[in-house]
Every structure is written in C-alpha cells, then in structure tokens.
From Swiss-Prot:
HAMAP family: SfsA (MF_00095). Transmembrane segments: none annotated. Belongs to the SfsA family. This is Sugar fermentation stimulation protein homolog. Gene3D superfamilies: 2.40.50.580, 3.40.1350.60. It comes from Aliivibrio fischeri (strain MJ11) (Vibrio fischeri). The lineage of its organism: Bacteria, Pseudomonadati, Pseudomonadota, Gammaproteobacteria, Vibrionales. CDD domains: SfsA-like_bacterial. Pfam families: SfsA (PF03749), SfsA_N (PF17746).
Length: 235
C-alpha cells in the first residue's frame, strides 16, 4: 500500500473527542486532523510525539487530513488508522503473500454472515474448498520485551466476532482470526486476558472449535505499508 502523496508529519498536541487530534506543523501552525481509531490507543498518542498524516482529495470533508502513523520515543512506528489493517491484509492475500491462504482464487469483503448478523471482513472462496471466513484485528499494544497484546480494551464487538467464527468452523467452513501487527516494536503476540478475560475465554473456545490464528506484521513508513513477516502467537 503506497501513500500518494507521501505522508506529512507534525507533532501531536492532543487527541480528543475520540475522532480528533490537534497537531503542530514545522512552521508552528496548528491543524486539526481526523482520527479513525476509537480505541484506547495506549502508548500511541503521547503528546509531542511525531505523527504522520494523509490528505484526502475529497474537498467536502470537514477534516481533510487523517492520522496514519505515530512514532514513539523509542523510535517505533505504529499505524493508528484502524481502517488500514483490512486493506493491508486484502492486499497481502491478493499478492499471494500469506502462504496459508494462497489456494483461494476469489475474495470478497464485508459479507453478511452468522447468526448474530455480522459482516465478515474477508470471505475467500475457491473450487472444491471450504469457504474461508477471515476476521482482521489490528495489534498495536506493546508491553515489555517485544510482547504485543490484543485487545487494548474490553471489546464486546470482538467477543461477538469470536462467536461467529466458532459457528463457521463448526459448520465445516475455514475460519481465521488474523492479527495484523501494526507496531514495529512487537515481536510476538498474546491475548490480553488481564484486559478482557471474556475475550480470552472465547478465543480458547474458538481454537478448540477449529478457528485458525494467523499473525503477521507490517513494515510502515511515510511512503508505504506492507505485510512482510509472520510472528509467533500464544494464547
């Protein structure tokens, strides 16, 4: 995924009202940008940190700039735009970069499924293959020693998705929970049972029901983002 034009940078003043952030540019002018991430953003939104933002060509947008990346004091890069995770995984699958999913030849997004009326992030189909339901989750919470965690806050929506994936697996389909690691400092991923114990329990059930876990990391810069490597996962 290439950023065209290349992302611009500034210094974070503050994030507020969940969807907005104020930044200071190199000329000391201030600008309000849109924040697509409604989560806790733990460790991703420290005042005076460097942020990178894109500019929309849609002239009707009230806030044409979108917060894309943050750089931490340890020089780690984090993608804070939650919309990018799905786009990156779709691109990686289409470019045959996810070895576990290369046998499928058709990809759809946002397809209705399940008894709880959800929409699956990605649906893969192929001749003589079970349908493959993929739910994508962005991982940006870093603890000590390169340990990444998901989720960074209690997620009832995520719990629902695990129930839906379990249902698909039990019906004979392939079900995948795909962790897109969008923090350059993360070296391995685990479930944050200390944050959302119910999610942890549901994931154990999901794995027992046949849900597959994939965990891949992206490289990120002001010019592009790309899924590049598989990371270890533990429950």
């Amino acid at each position: 995924m290439k950023f065209e034009p290349e992302l611009e940078s500034g210094k974070l003043i503050k994030r507020y009202k969940r969807f907005l952030a104020d930044i200071k540019l190199e000329d000391n002018s201030e600008r309000t940008i849109h924040c697509a991430n409604t989560g806790a953003m733990t460790g991703c939104a420290e005042p005076d940190s460097t942020v990178f933002f894109s500019t929309s060509s849609n002239l009707k947008r009230k806030y044409p700039n979108s917060w894309e990346l943050s750089v931490t004091e340890n020089n780690h890069t984090i993608c804070v735009n939650t919309l990018r995770a799905n786009q990156l995984v779709v691109e990686a699958i289409q470019e045959q970069n996810i070895k576990e999913l290369t046998e499928y030849d058709e990809l759809k997004t946002e397809v209705k499924y399940g008894s709880e009326n959800s929409r699956i992030d990605i649906l893969l189909t192929g001749k003589s293959l079970p349908d493959c339901y993929i739910e994508v989750k962005s991982v940006t919470l870093l603890s000590e020693s390169g340990q990444g965690f998901f989720p960074d806050a209690v997620t009832t929506r995520g719990q629902k998705h695990l129930r839906e994936l379990s249902e698909m697996a039990q019906l004979g389909h392939k079900a995948v929970l795909f962790f897109a690691v969008l923090h350059s400092g993360i070296e391995k991923v685990s479930i944050a049972h200390h944050i959302d114990q119910q999610y942890h329990s549901l994931l154990i059930d999901a794995i027992e029901n046949g849900v597959n876990i994939l965990c891949y990391q992206a490289e990120m810069s002001s010019k592009e983002m790309k899924i590049v490597r598989k990371l270890p996962f533990s429950i």
